């Protein structure tokens, strides 16, 4: 086994909590009151969609290569894991890009000096 029993318990707890945290974050962005239609598009159909794909990729990665896997994974498992990791990284980048565009398109969002209106912490 590659991980200790304590580490496996930590992985399980983190994975078990992932769906709830994902749903909470997605709901916050879908319900975010934005005045710009473009910002709303980036929040709901960009960020939220990519977040769903990211959640799916991470979930599938844990199914293909569970932390408690005994022995060496076969080539198919490694290929699937590689694809899911690459997919996750693409969607992390896409999420960041969508958030950047949301902040550019939504009027009234100011710099870090917090002068003027800003989005509430999500």
Residue ranges of predicted features:
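Charged alpha-helical initiation segments
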Residues: 1-85
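Short non-catalytic regulatory patches outside canonical folded cores
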Residues: 43-44, 73-122
